[in-house]
Swiss-Prot record:
It comes from Micrurus corallinus (Brazilian coral snake). Keywords: Disulfide bond, Glycoprotein, Secreted, Signal, Toxin. Gene3D superfamilies: CD59. Residues 1-21 form the signal peptide. It is found in: Secreted. Belongs to the three-finger toxin family. Short-chain subfamily. Expressed by the venom gland. The lineage of its organism: Eukaryota, Metazoa, Chordata, Craniata, Vertebrata. This is Three-finger toxin 3FTx-1. The keyword Repressor does not apply. Glycans are attached at residue 78.
Amino acid sequence: MKTLLLTLVVVTIVCLDLGNSLICYNTMMQKVTCPEGKDKCEKYAVPVMRGKFYFSYQCTSKCHEGAYDVCCSTDLCNKSSTSG
């Protein structure tokens, strides 16, 4: 009985901890768990030459605001098939 109770407590702690972690893509298109305080995923455009952009992907607390930028707050929402 004690083992069952301990198992339930451990499972509850693990589930609660995982529920608070946002997962985003980083610039290398790897999945990363965002640190505390970074509650959004973003894809933002960095101009590299006239009319061409490099897209950066990251966890953030405040998103960039541009015509090609994406800001979202669900797991893996900042993936894009668009290339600059």
